[in-house]
């Protein structure tokens, strides 16, 4: 009995202490904090994140409490931005203040303590690798130079679709293979023998690293960090990934050039690594981190966007007919169309923009507020974790008529682009941390999509109708489809 009473006293004492600490932290919030839902002791608002994908749940919270909302997730204070106005203020007016990333167990393990570009802190290392990326690796000129790779891999994909004419094909799987091959050849100068293993690892890592870890939300708890099972899974995965990348890089050092000669992305990184005048030397882990950036951001996002575009066109047959008519008229007689050719395809551009509006590659963009500031009149404390809900902004009726409807024609009336200038549509982010690979990514979406629409007509399997299509998403950094896209391709006959 005495032991039971002692435990009750201890539990009451601990809970009382945690509640008092919780109230003390809340009282320390400066100025005019953003509105916040009622919270529970110790866990704060964690219970509100149940029951759906994070971007969906957070949209419901900001619809109720305002476009700028404060959440306490465990010990961590976070702010969600779900309007173009608040996002513009954070990413443009206060860009240097919000240019940092916050650490997580997933990013630290998979990206070697954030020694890459996507998750690096805003510092000399990030500025340097960003400059290399923009001027050397993924510039518009280099994107055009990768045209022969896109053409080669598209020819392979077309052969696969032709061989499956009249039969159901897993379009998601084949498109992912094509996207991975393009990135592999651009990065390493050749198709990798373990390319499939690398692609599977990247997909699994993105899924695992995109969740909320309790150890991230209670950073003061060494016990939660110790008991974090996902951490050990990620460490094992990181080891497997290192083994593959180390092998690729060693092979790359001894070969003279890629399959088509000239410099690939790894060549440029090795050349820069030897530059003694660089402020922040590029390490081998930094090279592996950047390659992982290219594969994770370049492979998954491009493939996912093509899959969503085809899904939306299959679900909206009248839009499919219009897109195919434009492509077949403008590209008639062009055997190997590339970036310059698709510039003429106005409706295709609208299809891609509408797809990115409804299915952004990064539904939530993480930032860290470095110092206290004000966003739309609300005080944001220093070191506050910030999540920009790109998915929610793209479906906000304040900016978009019939926001849940796939309608590429809306861009005839609304002049908005995806490069970070229009904050109603920022699938690649905005400000100084806008995705440097957006030109590479768009080329790897628009060119393959145009050719798939040009060469084939499509039907759904068995008795499925457009209304039956499952458009559900699954958790992941790139917002992928829950189920693969299965279609029946038939070769287009211009005379029929």
Curated annotation (Swiss-Prot):
Query: Which top class of enzyme applies to this chain?
Result: oxidoreductase
The main location class comes to membrane
In its UniProt entry, the species of origin is given as Origanum majorana
Q: Which SUPFAM superfamilies would you find in this protein's record?
A: Cytochrome P450 (SSF48264)
Pfam families, alphabetized:
p450
- Sites binding heme sit at 435
What highest taxon heads this organism's lineage?
A: Eukaryota
EC number(s) recorded for this UniProt protein: 1.14.14.-, 1.14.14.51, 1.14.14.53
Cofactors: heme
Keyword annotations: Heme, Iron, Membrane, Metal-binding, Monooxygenase, Oxidoreductase, Signal-anchor, Transmembrane, Transmembrane helix
Cited InterPro entries: CYP450_71D (IPR052306), Cyt_P450 (IPR001128), Cyt_P450_CS (IPR017972), Cyt_P450_E_grp-I (IPR002401), Cyt_P450_sf (IPR036396)
What this chain does, per the entry, is described as: Involved in the biosynthesis of phenolic monoterpenes natural products thymol and carvacrol which have a broad range of biological activities acting as antimicrobial compounds, insecticides, antioxidants and pharmaceutical agents. Catalyzes the C2-hydroxylation of gamma-terpinene to produce carvacrol. Mediates also the C6-hydroxylation of (4S)-limonene and (4R)-limonene to form carveol.
Q: In which pathway does it act?
A: Secondary metabolite biosynthesis; terpenoid biosynthesis
Q: Which GO terms describe its molecular function?
A: heme binding; iron ion binding; monooxygenase activity; oxidoreductase activity, acting on paired donors, with incorporation or reduction of molecular oxygen
Matching entries from PANTHER family are given as:
OS06G0641600 PROTEIN, OS08G0105600 PROTEIN
The residues that cross the membrane are: 1-21
Membrane topology term: Single-pass type II membrane protein
Q: Which PROSITE patterns match?
A: CYTOCHROME_P450
The family line of this record is: Belongs to the cytochrome P450 family.
Name of this chain's protein: Cytochrome P450 71D180
Q: Name one GO biological process term.
A: terpenoid biosynthetic process
Region called Disordered, residue ranges: 471-496
């Amino acid at each position: 009995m005495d032991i039971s009473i002692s435990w009750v006293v201890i539990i009451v004492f601990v809970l009382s202490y945690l509640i008092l600490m919780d109230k003390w932290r809340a009282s320390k919030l400066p100025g005019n904090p953003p509105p916040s839902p009622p919270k529970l002791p110790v866990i704060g608002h964690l219970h509100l994140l149940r029951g759906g994908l994070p971007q969906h749940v957070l949209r419901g919270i900001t619809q109720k409490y305002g476009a700028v909302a404060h959440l306490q997730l465990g010990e961590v204070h976070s702010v969600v931005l779900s309007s173009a106005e608040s996002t513009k203020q954070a990413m443009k007016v206060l860009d240097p203040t919000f240019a940092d990333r916050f650490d997580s167990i997933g990013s630290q393990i998979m990206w070697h303590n954030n020694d890459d570009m996507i998750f690096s802190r805003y510092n000399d290392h990030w500025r340097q690798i960003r400059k290399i990326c923009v001027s050397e690796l993924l510039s518009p000129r280099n994107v055009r130079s990768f045209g022969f790779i896109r053409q080669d891999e598209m020819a392979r994909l077309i052969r696969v679709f032709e061989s499956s004419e009249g039969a159901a094909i897993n379009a998601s799987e084949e498109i992912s293979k094509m996207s991975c091959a393009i990135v592999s050849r651009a990065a390493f100068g050749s198709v990798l023998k373990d390319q499939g293993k690398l692609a599977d690892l990247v997909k699994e890592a993105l899924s695992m690293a995109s969740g909320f870890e309790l150890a991230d939300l209670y950073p003061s708890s060494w016990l939660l960090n110790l008991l974090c099972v996902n951490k050990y899974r990620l460490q094992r995965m990181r080891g497997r990934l290192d083994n593959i990348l180390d092998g690729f890089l060693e092979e790359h050092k001894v070969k003279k050039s890629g399959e088509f000669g000239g410099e690939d992305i790894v060549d440029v990184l090795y050349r820069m690594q030897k530059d003694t005048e660089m402020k922040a030397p590029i390490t081998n882990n930094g090279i592996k981190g950047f390659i992982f950036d290219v594969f994770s951001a370049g492979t998954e996002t491009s493939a996912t966007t093509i899959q969503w575009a085809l899904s939306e066109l299959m679900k909206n047959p009248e839009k499919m007919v219009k897109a195919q008519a434009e492509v077949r008229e403008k590209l008639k007689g062009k055997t190997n169309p590339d970036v310059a050719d698709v510039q003429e395809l106005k409706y295709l551009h609208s299809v891609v923009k509408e797809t990115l509006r409804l299915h952004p590659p990064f539904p939530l963009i993480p930032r860290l507020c470095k110092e206290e500031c004000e966003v739309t009149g609300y005080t944001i404390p220093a070191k506050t974790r910030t999540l920009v809900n790109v998915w929610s902004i793209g479906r906000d009726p304040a900016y978009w008529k019939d926001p849940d409807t796939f309608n590429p024609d809306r861009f005839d009336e609304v002049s908005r682009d995806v490069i970070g200038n229009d904050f109603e549509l920022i699938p690649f982010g905005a400000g100084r941390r806008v995705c440097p690979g957006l030109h590479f990514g768009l080329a790897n979406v628009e060119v393959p999509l145009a050719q798939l629409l040009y060469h084939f007509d499509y039907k759904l399997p068995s008795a499925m109708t457009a209304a039956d299509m499952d458009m559900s998403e699954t958790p992941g950094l790139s917002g992928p489809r829950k189920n693969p896209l299965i279609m029946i391709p038939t070769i287009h006959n211009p005379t029929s």
